[in-house]
Amino acid sequence: MSGNPHDRYIEIQAGLAQTQYECLPMPPHTAWEWLEAYGAMNAGPAQIHGAWHGAQAAVEARLETLIPQERLEQLLRQTRDTMAKRPAQALFCRGSGWGALENLRRAHAGEPPLSPQLDFGVPGAEQAPWRALLERGAMGEYDPREPVSSWLPDARYLPLLAQAAQGAERENWHTWLQLGAALLTQGRFADARDALARADSLARCAWVKYACSCLHLMQHEPERAAVYARQAAEAAPEDASVLKFALRVLLEARQYGEALRLIAAAPPELQRLPRVRLSEAQALVGLERLEEAEAILLQDGGLIVPDIREGEQTMSEVWLALQQKKYGLEREAAEKIAPVPYRMDFRMN
């Protein structure tokens, strides 16, 4: 699966849907249970590598002799009460505090807790402002120079946020920011704009500018989004994530010169980040500075961007845009002359 014949790699994936591209809506208060078994099996090559339906039937028949389906169902029934619903005797790893926060919210609302047999611990530092909101009706002070520790797009917190913002925390930029972000996730753009404008008036803060940029992106206003994204990066010049976000927004708005100026103003250690170098190459292609862009992409045997996501096509798109302009050809013809290098091609097909 890695694409390199010299790499020994196997990946096991399982789920209820047929493929990764599908999803199954899960109704509230529903439990889905299943049991999986993994192991080796032998079968005749002629059967396994023959027609699909025949191969499928051969594998199913062989598996039925190794571990019958009814045996799996029996094990599932047996373990439902003896294991799945039994409180743990030893805790090996503590998870995040979000489950604990939800149990706290449920207790305040008079609702039953999450799975009572599970130990969700207590809310931690990330959940501290939300715990304070539940218990005291106020999130408390927050340093605008520090990254926002958490966001909670849960409509059930909206009334609490609104009450705090209109009352005891009317001068608290962080409460207004969280209210604006929550409204944004609910599609209430006009209300979100008002809340974020209030937050922006209370503090010069990268995270407020970031949220304002997201608002304008969602409203298909790339130029306004770019203004706030640039301001966010200027307010947090040492933050790599803000710089990467700002560059993406500027490039989407085709403000290539602004993107290069932002990179030039960044600290050297951020300028050298592979994702920033990729954005620089993209901006250079947009400005027809093709040799400079190609030099970045091909440096040291080819640019490697560790934080690129599976299926993300940014690298291949930048490469092909460069080749189209370089040769003056349509995309397909340019790719025949200069195919996307192996190290840059993350396309799924």
Name the predicted role of every residue range:
Residues 169-170, 203-204, 237, 271, ...:
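Short coil turns that delineate tetratricopeptide repeat
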Residues 25-42:
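Short Pro-Gly-centered flexible turn/kink motifs
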Residues 1-24, 30, 84-99, 103-118:
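A contiguous, surface-exposed recognition patch within enzymatic or periplasmic domains that forms
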